[in-house]
């Protein structure tokens, strides 16, 4: 099993990533040199632990956003996703296909002028038991 990382290691790695993200890579040796340059770390062992966890987090960041870490590129990507507007609005179509419950909800909210086509709900498949 792996070792448990201390709060100091995790916090230091997060700070290093937030401040120096463009310089960091997925390579431990490179990250070790960068951590050594940008931070004053008392021991070689602690420096290596911070560099190792930084490399681990960088690999996780490649797959998607990581909780607790925000840097400029990630913020810009999040803003871009939040500001996304589709080319054609779903409500601009001639008719919107909805079920009866959705039509009733639209009517109660005052959107009864939207042309809708009520479809019968699709029958749900029941699970088959193994024999």
From Swiss-Prot:
Compartments reported by the entry: Cytoplasm
PANTHER family tied to this protein: 40S RIBOSOMAL PROTEIN S17
Name recorded for this polypeptide: Small ribosomal subunit protein eS17A
Subunit and interaction comment: Component of the small ribosomal subunit (SSU). Mature yeast ribosomes consist of a small (40S) and a large (60S) subunit. The 40S small subunit contains 1 molecule of ribosomal RNA (18S rRNA) and at least 33 different proteins. The large 60S subunit contains 3 rRNA molecules (25S, 5.8S and 5S rRNA) and at least 46 different proteins.
Organism: Schizosaccharomyces pombe (strain 972 / ATCC 24843) (Fission yeast)
GO cellular component, one term: cytosol
GO biological process: cytoplasmic translational elongation; ribosome biogenesis
Other comments on record: There are 2 genes for eS17 in S.pombe.
């Amino acid at each position: 099993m792996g070792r448990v990382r201390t709060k100091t290691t995790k916090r230091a790695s997060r700070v290093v990533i937030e401040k120096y993200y463009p310089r960091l890579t997925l390579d431990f040796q490179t990250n070790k040199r960068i951590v050594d340059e940008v931070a004053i770390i008392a021991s070689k062992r602690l420096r290596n632990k911070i560099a190792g966890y930084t490399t681990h987090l960088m690999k996780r960041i490649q797959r998607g956003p990581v909780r607790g870490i925000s840097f400029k590129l990630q913020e810009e990507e999040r803003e871009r996703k939040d500001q996304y507007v589709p080319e054609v609005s779903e409500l601009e179509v001639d008719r919107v296909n909805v079920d009866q419950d959705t039509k009733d909800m639209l009517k109660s909210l005052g959107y009864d002028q939207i042309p809708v086509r009520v479809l019968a709900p699709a029958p749900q498949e029941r699970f088959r038991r193994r024999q």
